[in-house]
């Protein structure tokens, strides 16, 4: 793989986040020791497929457990690669059903910038932790709404 400096920096930051978050959880929960953080990936574009998903799969502290995509076939292909069960593949229309999926601890939002606020807020309402790509939102109002969740 031929990486430029920008891609290397992004991949390094995401890998660090993917491995650090479960340690924070484990420090606060005696029952979490040795448990992997279970990720739902929202958006199957280049950033998530080329960087975040491989980093989580390679980590000792993370596991991919759900996918959200507007393209079912693409999601099924990725699910097969990462052993994500078919019932844990969601469309944008069925996204709110993640609330019932106890195999998702948090979601990684890798959607177009204009969609960050909506899907972050919906995940928070579903009781899921959120890691959102940058920029957080496209307006101050959206950012505030995300923070206030």
Predicted regions and their residues:
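N-terminal secretory signal peptides and thylakoid transit peptides that target proteins
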Residues: 1-15
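Alpha-helical structural signal in soluble globular domains
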Residues: 55-59, 78-81, 122-126, 145-149
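A structural signal for short, well-ordered beta-strand elements
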Residues: 1-2, 68, 88-91
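An amphipathic alpha-helix/helix-turn recognition signal
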Residues: 7, 35, 70, 74, ...
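N-terminal Rossmann-like dinucleotide-binding module
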Residues: 11-83
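Beta-loop-alpha module in the N-terminal Rossmann-like domain of NAD(P)-dependent dehydrogenases
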Residues: 88-147
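Intrinsically disordered, low-complexity regulatory regions of eukaryotic regulatory proteins
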Residues: 5, 23, 27-28, 103, ...
